[in-house]
């Protein structure tokens, strides 16, 4: 049965979005969760903003009833009496905005001694209590640790600035406060955060000379590319960001306005300028000139801050650096460390700070510069760098389908001059699945999205398939589909799904990519779709396949009208599938 893409979009996207909000709101009532996880999650719920703005800064969530006891249990295992905690910090930014913070310090500070310091920046929709467990761990090791809520979140004042100039000013004010009020070693200050905090950390280490190093987890390099990569709005994650921002913070109206512009493909130049100011990629030259070291963790199934833009950002850096690419959706590979659980990413983060801020030769710089975790929670592979000398691009040629056969993925060039036409207006069985849910199942529970490609609608989609592979195909990085297309309306969305097809004929979704066009009706245009990077071994004897269609629930379509999409096949301009592989 075919379901129109508008209906599918409403059902799948809406269900996933409200499930996400439901889980956020009632997670503390789940009787099956561990007490430690409950406490930590409860600590993250913003509140008491009115009390703060009225001057009662001490009435924080950390000091109230059941919330206080839950938060206490989250880091009680770390509380051995070796550190102190101050929950009444208020820092005034340059424009007078109140920034809420907390401070962990080693107990019995030695007069005149300076201490290495780490600043934690909250994730989107969370607050200064997000990192209480990591802060306690670091304080026990002799660090001063300050965590703060960015403006617009928690009990900090102001409107959410989305890593803009005001957020930079706030970070500088935090550094001023540390110097004036603590025994900070000003030559050994690090910064870290997850998601929103990661982006601000990368921006911070790039512009603030007082910050020596950064650890960024699930962050972004290019904000426009994250929200509008290949001219395609990230519908699901955009709605989550906007919804969570309104539910938990005080949103600057420009944020929703800009997302609306992306959905309508309006004033893209203006949104691009707004996003560039908030992108670490815009400050690469400054960071490279400073030589400051950076450790980055990113997740392969992060469809918000997708892995391709983080790989490109990492490749542009010439500073001492390390990159771990993990299985997981946005922030899921790192969240365990926030809850105090064993986590290799956080272990590396602690070692990174110990090496760069305390001079401890712990072997962190002897570890591989780049690691990729294999798809479906597999083992890690190591690479000497990125781009890697061990990875090359293998190119296949795409041959058009015929009346009775699907298209072919071949090692030899296409010799036929044929167009393959499909219609929009209906989804196919080629899909990323149910947003968030399918992504989590695949990345953490090894339950892949599958499709019997023989049943894919030839009216609404195209399949290309290879012969059985004679040897293992070790994918290490990006996959690129390159071709020529035209649309009867000039607008079109092209989604490319890459499958590992076993002997049973069922395709296992390995990765996908998307791109949209906005040209004149029937105008032929070159199009490249970069599929999300992945590490995966396709076994010998299996086949590889790709499916093309015009809708996926993760993304906003360029038009609600039905259009015809022509995919061109021309011997003089080959359509190709290029795979980065070992």
Where are these regions (language model features)?
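Accessory cap/linker subdomain of secreted extracellular hydrolases
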Residues: 45, 49-77, 140, 192, ...
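C-terminal, loop-rich substrate-recognition/catalytic regions characterized by aromatic stacking residues
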Residues: 58-60, 340-582
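Short beta-strand/loop motif that positions the catalytic acidic residue
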Residues: 290, 296-298
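N-terminal cap/lid segment of alpha/beta-hydrolase-fold proteins
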Residues: 69-113, 469-471
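Short substrate-entry loop that stabilizes the transition state in hydrolases
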Residues: 109-115, 120-155, 303-306
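Gly/Ser-rich "nucleophile elbow"/oxyanion-hole loop immediately N-terminal to the catalytic nucleophile
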Residues: 108-114, 161-166, 173-195
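C-terminal motif of bacterial Sec signal peptides marking the signal peptidase cleavage site
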Residues: 22-25
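Short alpha-helix in the alpha/beta-hydrolase fold that links the catalytic acid
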Residues: 305-314
């Amino acid at each position: 049965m075919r379901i129109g893409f508008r209906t599918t979009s409403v059902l799948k996207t809406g269900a996933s979005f409200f499930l996400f909000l439901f889980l956020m709101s009632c997670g503390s009532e789940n009787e099956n969760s561990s007490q430690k996880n409950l406490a930590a999650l409860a600590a993250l719920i913003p509140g008491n903003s009115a009390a703060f703005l009225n001057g009662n800064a001490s009435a924080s969530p950390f000091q109230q009833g059941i919330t206080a006891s839950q938060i206490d249990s989250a880091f009680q295992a770390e509380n051995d009496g070796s550190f102190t905690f101050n929950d009444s910090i208020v820092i005034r930014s340059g424009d007078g905005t109140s920034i809420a913070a907390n401070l962990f310090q080693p107990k019995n500070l030695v007069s005149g001694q300076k201490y290495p310091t780490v600043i934690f920046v909250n994730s989107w929709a969370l607050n200064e209590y997000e990192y209480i467990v990591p802060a306690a761990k670091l304080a026990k090791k002799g660090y001063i640790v300050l965590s703060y809520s960015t403006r617009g979140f928690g009990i900090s004042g102001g409107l959410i600035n989305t890593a803009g100039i005001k957020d930079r000013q706030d970070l500088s004010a935090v550094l001023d406060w540390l110097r004036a009020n603590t025994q900070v070693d000003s030559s050994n200050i690090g910064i870290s955060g997850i998601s929103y905090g990661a982006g601000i950390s990368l921006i911070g280490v790039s512009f603030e000379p007082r910050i020596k190093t950064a650890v960024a987890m699930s962050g972004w390099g290019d904000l426009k590319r994250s929200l509008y990569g290949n001219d395609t709005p990230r519908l699901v994650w955009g709605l989550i960001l906007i919804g969570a921002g309104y539910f938990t913070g005080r949103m600057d109206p420009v944020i929703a306005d800009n997302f609306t512009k992306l959905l309508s493909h309006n004033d893209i130049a203006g949104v691009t300028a707004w996003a560039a100011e908030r992108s670490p990629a815009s400050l690469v030259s400054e960071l490279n000139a400073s030589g400051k070291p950076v450790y980055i963790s990113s997740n392969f199934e992060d469809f918000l801050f997708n892995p391709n833009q983080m790989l490109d950002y990492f490749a542009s850096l010439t500073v001492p650096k390390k990159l771990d690419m993990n299985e997981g959706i946005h922030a899921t590979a790192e969240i365990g460390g926030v809850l105090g659980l064993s986590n290799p990413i956080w272990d590396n983060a602690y070692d990174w700070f110990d090496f760069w801020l305390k001079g401890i030769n712990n072997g962190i710089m002897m570890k591989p510069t780049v690691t990729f975790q294999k798809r479906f929670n597999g083992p890690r592979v190591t690479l000497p760098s990125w781009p890697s000398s061990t990875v090359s691009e293998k190119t296949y040629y795409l041959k058009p389908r015929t009346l009775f056969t699907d298209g072919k993925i071949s090692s030899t060039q296409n010799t036929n001059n044929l167009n393959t036409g499909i219609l929009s207006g209906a989804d196919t069985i080629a899909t990323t699945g149910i947003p968030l849910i399918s992504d989590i199942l695949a990345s953490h529970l090894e339950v892949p999205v599958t499709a019997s490609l023989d049943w894919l609608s030839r009216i609404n989609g195209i399949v290309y398939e290879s012969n059985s592979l004679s040897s293992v195909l070790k994918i290490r990085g990006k996959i690129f589909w390159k071709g020529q297309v035209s649309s009867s309306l000039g607008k079109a969305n092209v989604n490319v799904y890459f499958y590992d097809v076993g002997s049973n004929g069922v395709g296992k979704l390995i990765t996908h990519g998307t791109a949209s066009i906005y040209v004149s009706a029937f105008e032929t245009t070159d199009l490249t779709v970069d599929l999300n990077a992945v590490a995966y071994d396709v076994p010998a004897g299996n086949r590889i396949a790709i499916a093309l269609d015009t809708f996926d629930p993760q993304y906003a379509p360029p038009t609600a009208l039905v259009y015809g999409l022509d995919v061109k096949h021309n011997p003089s301009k080959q359509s190709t599938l290029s795979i980065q592989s070992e």
